Amino acid sequence: MSGGSTGERPFSDIITSVRYWVIHSITIPSLFIAGWLFVSTGLAYDVFGTPRPNEYFSENRQQVPLINDRFNAREELDDLTSNL
């Protein structure tokens, strides 16, 4: 059996059609604007639970919270989070 048609439209026909560009001239900029608003309004910080740039360091603790001893990590973690 030779390679026959799958019944799908060729990609070149799709991207040269007016219908494709009418739909995508609206959806592509809309997705870009939605993503920009998602990040610029700070909603991305809330959804993913990441701290905002001004929340990385508290007033009491200005050093980077590093764990130095892996065998006593629980104690170091408790010390680092006790001021939060």
From Swiss-Prot:
The chain crosses the membrane at residues 22-36. InterPro entries: PSII_cyt_b559_asu, PSII_cyt_b559_asu_sf, PSII_cyt_b559_CS, PSII_cyt_b559_N, PSII_cytb559_asu_lum. The keyword Metal-binding applies. The keyword Mitochondrion does not apply. One of its GO terms (cellular component) is chloroplast thylakoid membrane. GO terms for molecular function: electron transfer activity; heme binding; iron ion binding. Heme binds at H24. Its cofactor is heme b. With its partner (PsbF) binds heme. PSII binds additional chlorophylls, carotenoids and specific lipids. Keywords: Chloroplast, Electron transport, Heme, Iron, Membrane, Metal-binding, Photosynthesis, Photosystem II, Plastid, Thylakoid, Transmembrane, Transmembrane helix, Transport. It is a single-pass membrane protein. Belongs to the PsbE/PsbF family. Heterodimer of an alpha subunit and a beta subunit. PSII is composed of 1 copy each of membrane proteins PsbA, PsbB, PsbC, PsbD, PsbE, PsbF, PsbH, PsbI, PsbJ, PsbK, PsbL, PsbM, PsbT, PsbY, PsbZ, Psb30/Ycf12, at least 3 peripheral proteins of the oxygen-evolving complex and a large number of cofactors. It forms dimeric complexes. This b-type cytochrome is tightly associated with the reaction center of photosystem II (PSII). PSII is a light-driven water:plastoquinone oxidoreductase that uses light energy to abstract electrons from H(2)O, generating O(2) and a proton gradient subsequently used for ATP formation. It consists of a core antenna complex that captures photons, and an electron transfer chain that converts photonic excitation into a charge separation. This is Cytochrome b559 subunit alpha. It comes from Cyanidium caldarium.
